Regions:
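Adenylate-forming
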Residues: 269, 302-331, 360-380, 400-404, ...
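Conserved pre-ATP/AMP-binding loop-to-beta segment of ANL
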Residues: 20-43, 50, 73-79
Length: 445
């Protein structure tokens, strides 16, 4: 479905109509395909090395299309709004193949810049998102609240407090009323019909998920890799535990190896890496277990992701540190956009921090300081002091060896164009370290 630039509804649609002969040939080819025949090659994101071609047979798609609707109540009337790249397995399966299999409607946005407008216009019921988008939308909502009159600010805070209490099963008599007063206005910005945000592609910080859930906006976090066609676990609407990625899908086995690595087995697992038999053998063992490279634990049947195995930091004193939870704590600050921890072979944990430059600029302006360029902000003494305080707050409650002892400010936001982010908005740690080698060296001194 191609969106028209005119009108308030998706309205004008153009559907490609292949000629009859090519359509017949397509149907015959589809009917002749077996479940072990190759359906597609999807390349990994390349965050930890050279991208590899993942061979996904038809069974991975047919199995998941049959099972997902038993986890999330999807229907033909649903409208999906697609903005993630179709080269990414999450969007290819859950945003393209799955809705097509059930006859749902898909709208495609023109660009990220038009996403907000398209959400109001298309009025989606389901949206696949990555954590970075939810964090960005959360920041915009909070900025809007700060500009609102005091009464509206107080109502928003009360809605958050009551909503969180309701989530935890505590007494929250005003939660429903405040959701109607506050949450409904935010939902309207998303089109007014949104049933679920489904988050994948990277770990979603618990505080971000709780922010939306407290307002009555359902965010379901799932877990999967390119190697298992994007879906292995997902939270259910009736039992949504935002600190986990939910229980496994029916037919997916999850096992935790002695070293903490998550292993997966089931009909959604790839055939292997294209023309890379050694890499395939290192990832898929003889018993059919997929070694994910992720570290996690099972909690009452739900899977919780701790970090990437390759990302674990080993300090000079031998202590192991999982960077992802600490990075998430840092990013809870309204003034920190991104954080990348370092520490291998070092005396302590250190961090490269990207400030939330727009918000920092507003903060400076309120103090009477007119500094707008990121390069200037990153070295301004007021900003350095501000971020230092935010780091100290994030360190509270951490063990001493986990605390960020030193940090530097990166003088530019991360971007896809700059190479620091993948098309699905994940941080390429290797690129960041290489691009800002001077900052890394400064932290090691």
């Amino acid at each position: 479905v191609l969106l028209s630039k005119e009108g308030d509804q998706p309205g004008l649609r153009e559907r490609a109509q292949p000629d009859q002969l090519s359509q017949d040939a397509w149907v015959q080819g589809a009917q002749a395909a077996g479940e072990e025949d190759l359906a597609t090659l999807i390349y990994t994101s390349g965050t930890t090395g050279v991208p590899k071609g993942v061979m996904l047979p038809h069974r991975t798609f047919t199995y998941l299309c049959a099972d997902i609707p038993s986890c999330i109540p999807l229907k033909e009337e649903d409208v999906f709004l697609s903005f993630l790249p179709l080269s990414h397995v999450f969007e290819r399966f859950a945003g393209h193949v799955l809705p097509m299999s059930m006859g749902a409607t898909i709208g495609y946005v023109g660009s990220l810049a038009s996403l907000g407008h398209d959400m109001e216009r298309v009025k989606p019921t389901i949206m696949l998102v990555v954590p970075r988008l939810l964090e960005s939308l959360k920041g915009r909502i909070e900025d809007g609240v700060l500009k609102a009159p005091p009464l509206r600010q107080r109502l928003f805070r009360m809605a958050q407090e009551q909503g969180l209490k309701r989530m935890r099963g505590e007494f929250a008599p005003l939660a429903g009323v405040l959701e109607g007063l506050v949450g409904s206005k935010i939902k309207a910005k998303f089109g007014g019909r949104l049933r679920y945000f489904v988050s994948g592609g990277a770990a979603l910080p618990t505080h971000v998920s709780e922010f939306y859930l407290a307002l009555g906006i359902h965010v379901l976090q799932g877990y999967g890799l390119t190697e298992n066609c994007a879906a292995a676990c997902i939270n259910r609407p009736e039992d949504n535990r935002p600190d986990t990625v939910g229980p496994p899908l029916k037919g997916v086995e999850v096992k935790i190896a002695p070293d903490g690595e998550i292993l997966l087995r089931g009909r959604c697992i790839m055939q292997g890496y294209y023309n890379l038999p050694e890499d395939t053998a290192a990832t898929l063992d003889a018993e059919g277990w997929l070694h994910t490279g992720d570290i996690g634990e099972l909690d009452r049947g739900n899977l919780r992701i701790t970090d990437r195995k390759k990302d674990l930091l080993v300090l000079g004193n031998g202590k192991n540190v999982a960077p992802q939870p600490i990075e998430s704590r840092l990013k809870e600050s309204a003034y920190i956009n991104e954080a990348v921890l370092l520490g291998d072979g070092m005396e302590s944990v250190v961090a490269m921090i990207v400030p939330e430059f727009e918000r920092v600029a507003t903060w400076l302006k309120e103090k009477g300081v007119n500094v707008k360029e990121p390069e200037e902000m990153a070295v301004h003494p007021d900003v350095i002091a501000l971020i230092k305080g935010e780091v100290q707050r994030a360190n509270e409650g951490l063990a001493d060896f986990e605390r960020v002892k030193r940090h530097v400010l990166v003088p530019a936001p991360f971007s896809i164009e700059g190479g620091e982010l993948t098309p699905s908005l994940k941080v390429r740690r290797k690129v960041v370290k290489e691009k800002y080698a001077n900052l890394v060296d400064a932290l090691k001194r």
